[in-house]
């Protein structure tokens, strides 16, 4: 530890929409130091964190997955804490409804004004953003919730491709992206307050991983379709099955009956991407699936998705995903030994 005697107090916030796996994962890692004391010289002999689950009320709380957990204390009982962490929360298709947990957001804002870190895992930043502390500060969230977040909190700059964002004048706003990026969050907190060697020891014990490549490889591109421009929606529908044809942008313009400049302007305003960028994203998304599910060569996949120049395809793929095609395949393709073991079981189930 860095000369500190008293452990840091961590308040892990539980609301009914919370993800139990994320909440308990964070809890177990930060609270497990005492159990590992003496097993690794890199770990402190005194637990660096005191972790408790807090909520609107103490007692039993039923979560979104139907399971329950015990809330150790109500926020009314917590007058000071060093760290507020909100785990993943379920965000409905209709988006995040603000104002449901005003007592929690006011409490979190008060703790932050007293010096506490505000930390979120995945979609937990929806709740913390209601404090106003993230206004004008970079943050990240699960890519699947990025549109909902942008609509709910337009004053918060969003970077869903980033795993971890540390912001604020005193670096006291910490957000992590997609679900298991809570690994990066807890490892960062351990590095910051205990040390890098301790974080490495904890990572080894729990098999936690830093997401060094960011979240861009995990993002599934779907394209905005709720913009209300019927002409653009029609073009998107056609493009979804014809993105690999030669000159797809020119064909969309021809089919739309609009002037080229008008079509491109409306398409960009509606989707947030220029037509050629939209085509590229669809092609790369199809290439990702082919890399994951087939053994086709990178050159063959390049041709299949519409690129005659495999070298250009490789450069574009890395620019969009942050990874080379071969590295992406190694990361996401089901391991050969698993496929080999699963194949006989699939065949046996297919026999009537």
Enumerate the predicted regions with their spans.
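N-terminal functional module of multi-domain proteins
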Residues: 2-130
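A conserved active-site-flanking secondary-structure segment within enzyme catalytic domains
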Residues: 135-165, 201-202
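Short, structured loop/turn "capping" segments at alpha-beta junctions
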Residues: 156-160, 196-201, 212-217, 245-247
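Conserved anion/nucleotide-ligand pocket segment
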Residues: 166-205
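Short acidic/histidine-centered micro-motifs embedded in hydrophobic/aromatic stretches
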Residues: 202-209, 255
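A short, Lys/Arg-enriched amphipathic alpha-helix from helix-turn-helix/homeodomain DNA-binding modules
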Residues: 215, 220-247, 253-256, 260, ...
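Basic/polar phosphate-binding segments, predominantly the helix-turn-helix DNA-binding elements
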Residues: 240-241, 246-282, 302-327
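…primarily DNA-binding HTH/wHTH and HhH modules…
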Residues: 293, 297, 311-352
């Amino acid at each position: 530890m860095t000369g500190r005697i008293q452990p840091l107090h961590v308040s892990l916030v539980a609301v009914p929409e919370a993800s139990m796996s994320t909440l308990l994962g964070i809890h177990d890692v930060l609270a497990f130091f005492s159990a590992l004391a003496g097993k690794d010289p890199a770990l402190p002999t005194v637990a660096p964190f005191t972790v408790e689950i807090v909520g609107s009320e103490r007692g039993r709380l039923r979560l979104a997955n139907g399971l329950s957990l015990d809330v150790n204390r109500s926020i009314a009982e917590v007058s000071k804490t060093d760290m507020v962490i909100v785990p993943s929360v379920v965000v409905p298709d209709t988006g995040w409804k603000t104002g449901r947990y005003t007592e929690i957001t006011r409490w979190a804002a008060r703790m932050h004004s007293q010096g506490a870190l505000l930390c979120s895992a995945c979609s937990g930043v929806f709740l913390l953003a209601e404090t106003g502390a993230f206004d004008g500060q970079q943050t990240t969230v699960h890519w699947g919730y990025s549109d909902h977040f942008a609509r709910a909190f337009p004053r918060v700059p969003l970077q869903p491709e980033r795993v971890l964002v540390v912001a604020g004048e005193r670096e006291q706003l910490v957000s992590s992206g997609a679900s298991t990026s809570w690994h990066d969050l807890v490892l960062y907190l351990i590095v910051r307050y205990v040390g890098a060697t301790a974080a490495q020891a904890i990572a080894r014990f729990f098999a936690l991983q830093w997401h060094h490549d960011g979240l861009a490889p995990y993002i599934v591109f779907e394209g905005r379709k709720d913009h209300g421009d019927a002409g653009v929606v029609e073009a998107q529908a056609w493009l979804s099955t014809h993105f690999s044809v030669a000159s797809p942008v020119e064909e969309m313009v021809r089919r739309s009956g609009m002037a080229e400049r008008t079509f491109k302007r409306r398409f960009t305003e509606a989707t947030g991407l220029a037509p050629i960028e939209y085509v590229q994203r669809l092609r790369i998304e199809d290439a990702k699936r082919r890399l994951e599910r087939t053994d086709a060569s990178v050159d063959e996949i390049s041709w299949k998705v519409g690129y005659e120049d495999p070298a250009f395809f490789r450069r574009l793929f890395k620019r969009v995903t942050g990874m080379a095609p071969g590295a992406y395949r190694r990361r996401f393709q089901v391991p050969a030994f698993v496929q080999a073991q699963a194949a006989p079981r699939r065949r046996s189930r297919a026999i009537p």
